[in-house]
Amino acid sequence: DMFDDIFGNMFHGGSASGRSRRTSGFTGGFGGESFKSKGSDIKAGITVGFDEAAFGGDKVITLSNPENPGQPGQSLKVHIPAGIDNGKSIRLRGKGMPGTGGGEAGDLLLKVTVAPKPGYERKGMDVYTTVSVPYTTAVFGGEALVHTLYGDVMCKIKEGTQSGSKIRLRGKGIVSMKDSSVHGDQYVTIQIEVPRNLSPQARQKLKEFEEICQGSSRTA
């Protein structure tokens, strides 16, 4: 199909190839009258970074024609809405197939793929991370430095915190696409660091601690 060959384009700068969906137009009607028909939409894909999807912004992609690989491609500015997620589409109106009989052009639909970010997992508007805390901090309580999309924060670790416990950071998740005043949350899973290569003194103190705990459990 000639249109597929022309518009089966490659998008550079964070996107993949796309194919057009063509609908028939009618021209040369009765008495030579021309019937307007809107052009078909083109569907393609675009990959955006984790932070780009979270905060939004503008991204420039290049639309190239495979029949003229030596010619410079057409540059398009794409606005990434803050909060967009995997599988959502961005519509660029009038950037699809040309219409017939003077009809308007179709649209370009870019299906979004959000690239992963090490240490972060997204589920809807919520973000999930982990933080490692020393054994002593878990026992006695303290604070731990937690990375968020909005910068680092110090989180309180309660005395006697168990491995696998979760801390909820309200409003540190992804912004809602429908209401910019609404944000998801960040859930931080606690991982307790088991001490290694203990000094003889530390080992002795830990043994004493173990004996005290065992004694307490017997008398309880």
Give short role names for the model-derived ranges.
Residues 1-71, 77, 100-104, 109, ...:
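Post-J-domain flank of DnaJ/Hsp40 co-chaperones
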Residues 74-220:
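Intrinsically disordered, low-complexity linker/assembly segments
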